[in-house]
A protein has these predicted regions:
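Catalytic binding pocket for nucleotide-activated donors in carbohydrate/polymer assembly enzymes
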Residues: 10-17, 23-35, 39-44, 100-104, ...
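Membrane-proximal helix-turn-helix segments that form the acceptor-binding/catalytic region
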Residues: 90-106, 193, 197-202
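Structural motif
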Residues: 61-64, 81, 106, 374
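N-terminal pre-catalytic "stem/leader" segment of glycosyltransferase-like enzymes
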Residues: 1-79, 271-296, 307-314, 318-322, ...
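Nucleotide-sugar donor-binding catalytic core of glycosyltransferases
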Residues: 6, 14-20, 24, 122-382, ...
Length: 475
């Protein structure tokens, strides 16, 4: 399709320089091309100064950024519409989030905004946008595959929670906080730096006492029910805060970061990718590199306090780990023919023999989907329509996923697919029974895969996502 006078000119910026992020933004750009709009996908995030200049040079009128809002200090050209596409749950401790939006902006989330933890009022349109699949993925089903396996799971698992008690470090932390409580002086930036210089070799910058971490862990294990897709990060985070009330006020608030920035030059742009390595370091080399890169010398602007970072981990990442540990243990009761792919699995000793590494290319991932009799999927908050789910279905792979009370909400499986027809559904109580039934019925698995692939082609290509965005921009 050719462009016309009303065609948009769109710039799409990933969250990270990673194969997955690059594949997603390129797929969306191709979707825009298919419906007649110019779109350019960047391979990596760029500085706000560069983004504003690129909009001018390329005559961009729409910017889509993954997991980013507008920069409040460096405005885009006035005619540019901004779209934030958040693909992660929202941190419980996120402050000032609404300040990054204009009335003309759009915020998309990967699923239902409320379920994912968005609890602030925004001045702009808020909607849901799923990932899509491209024609190359659909065509991949024509390739032959061999060496079938009963079960596979492709995805990240957080490492196990391992911490050792250290009375020495806990006492140092206690004295450090006594110093902080000195009236007026204790909260000064100068004393904050002095304390960190004095204790930095004996006490990590983000240290949280063993007793606090243990209370947080026990709270989550008591409250969270794995493999039900009902995670409420606010409920868990608030519970952690209440139970940890004994330590309230013991965790220092980091001094505000001065948001005034220097304009980038060639040297700062060259060094910026390396500056992240030196966050929190106060040696001469670290300070010098971050200064030359025009970054805050000691930390990032979005750095959370140690207490808030621990809350985010236990309210978001720890439930994800519990889900996958429970799921794989259930699988091993059915069959030892199992392959696990992705980062994190090697850190779980009980699963190391099943870990086959991390797949770096899409073709390898699609091959695993096709040769697995059952592709395992789980989610903590009802987001069934993950990119892996859609890509697996697109090549005819068979998916098993647990039910969720959010299955009928945006991003839920029941918004597009029917259990028993397009995929296999299970609960924590009947996984083994359901898995055995699907393993023994090859024809039913094959039929479900074919029907799911047809549904993906008709509703979940990148061109469908591009059309949705164009329609939403005209609201």
């Amino acid at each position: 399709m050719t462009q016309d006078k009303t065609s948009l000119r769109i710039l799409i910026v990933p969250n990270y320089r990673s194969p997955y992020d690059q594949r997603m933004v390129k797929g969306l750009a191709d979707g825009f091309h298919q419906i007649g709009h110019y779109a350019r996908a960047l391979p990596a995030p760029i500085h706000a100064f560069e983004l504003a200049e690129m909009c001018k040079v390329l005559s961009i009128n729409v910017v889509i950024q993954v997991n980013q809002t507008r920069d409040p200090d460096i405005p885009l050209p006035s005619h540019v519409r901004h779209i934030s596409w958040f693909q992660d749950v929202f941190p419980e401790t996120l402050n000032g989030f609404a300040d990054g939006f204009h009335e003309s902006d759009i915020l998309y989330v990967l699923g239902d905004p409320g379920v994912l933890g968005l609890n602030v009022q925004l001045p702009c349109y808020v909607g849901s946008l799923m990932t899509g699949v491209d024609q190359a993925v659909i065509n991949h089903r024509q390739r032959s595959v061999s060496s079938p396996v009963d079960f596979s799971l492709c995805g990240f698992i957080p490492p196990p929670f391992v911490t050792t008690s250290s009375a020495r470090q806990d006492i140092l932390w206690y004295w450090d906080n006594l110093i902080r409580r000195i009236p007026v002086l204790g909260r000064s930036k100068v004393l904050w730096l002095i304390r960190k210089i004095l204790f930095r070799r004996q006490l990590p910058v983000n240290y949280v006492p063993y007793a606090v971490l243990s209370v947080m862990r026990d709270t989550i294990e008591m409250m969270y029910r794995p493999l039900r897709g009902e995670l409420d990060i606010h409920e868990l985070a608030n519970s952690i805060r209440k139970i940890s009330a004994l330590y309230e006020g013991s965790f220092p608030t980091l001094p505000a970061v001065d948001r005034k920035r220097r304009s980038p030059n060639r040297l700062s742009m060259l060094l910026k990718p390396y500056a992240q390595r030196y966050v929190g370091r106060r040696d001469i080399k670290g300070l010098f590199v971050r200064y030359l890169a025009a970054e805050n010398p000691t930390r990032n602007a979005d750095t959370l306090s140690p207490f808030d970072s621990a809350i985010n981990y236990f309210a978001q990442s720890y439930p994800r780990m519990l889900d996958r540990v429970v799921l794989i243990n259930d699988v091993l009761q059915v069959s030892k023919s199992l392959e696990l792919y992705g980062p994190g699995w090697a850190s779980h000793l009980e699963f190391q023999q099943y870990h086959k590494g991390t797949i770096e290319n899409q073709a390898g991932l699609l091959d695993v989907y096709r040769r697995s009799r059952i592709n395992l999927a789980n989610n903590t908050h009802g987001l069934g329509l993950h990119s892996r789910t859609l890509e697996c279905m697109a090549v005819g792979g068979f998916i098993m996923m647990h039910t969720s009370p959010h299955d009928n909400k945006p991003g839920g499986m029941l918004t597009s697919f029917e259990p028993g027809v397009h995929y296999g559904a299970f609960t924590p109580d009947n996984f083994q029974e359901e898995a055995l039934l699907w393993l023994e019925d090859k024809e039913k698995r094959k039929k479900a895969g074919l029907q799911a692939a047809e549904m993906v082609r008709s509703k979940h290509c990148w061109s469908h996502r591009a059309l949705q965005i164009v329609d939403d921009l005209s609201r």
